[in-house]
Amino acid sequence: MKFLSTLILLLSVLALVRGEQYNKFTVDLNGVCTNSGSLDTCTNQCGNAGGSFQISQSGGEYQYEQYATKDCDLMASLTSKFACLADEAPVTLGLGNIKITCQDPSNSASSPLTTAVLFVVAFAAAIALLL
């Protein structure tokens, strides 16, 4: 019984803390200019003269793509993968001159009702372990 309660508790907690998806980003290009963009949206950087960038996500990992054009229509001139650590926590790409701040997290897999049910199940499993 304790094994089953432990398993239910672990699965419930894992479901509650499953990865968040960040939907907005601020990109700082070496202090020269800062622009905000949304996930999967082509965004002009440094005004119309500076090209553009786009951030996409695949399996919890994000990818920054920089383009020479303002429409993201040619092959990316720079591509770099990164992970969002926390809301409003800046991530410096390996190149060192690009800082990305992940913003607007959402748990894309849970509705409030699902979260409440998982919390109740986890709480019940924890009580069962104590008995």
UniProtKB/Swiss-Prot annotation:
Predominant location category: membrane
Subcellular localization(s) per the UniProt record: Cell membrane
Disulfides per UniProt: none
Topology in the lipid bilayer: Lipid-anchor; GPI-anchor
Keyword annotations from UniProtKB, A to Z: Actin-binding, Cell membrane, Glycoprotein, GPI-anchor, Lipoprotein, Membrane, Signal
PTM annotation: The GPI-like-anchor contains a phosphoceramide group, rather than a phosphatidyl group.
GO cellular component: plasma membrane; side of membrane
Lipid-bearing positions (GPI-like-anchor amidated serine): S106
Annotated signal sequence range: 1-19
Residues cleaved off as propeptide: 107-131
GO molecular function: actin binding
Role noted for this protein: Binds F-actin and nucleates actin assembly.
Family membership noted in the UniProt record: Belongs to the ponticulin family.
Protein name stated in the entry: Ponticulin-like protein M
Protein species of origin: Dictyostelium discoideum
Gene name per UniProt: ponM
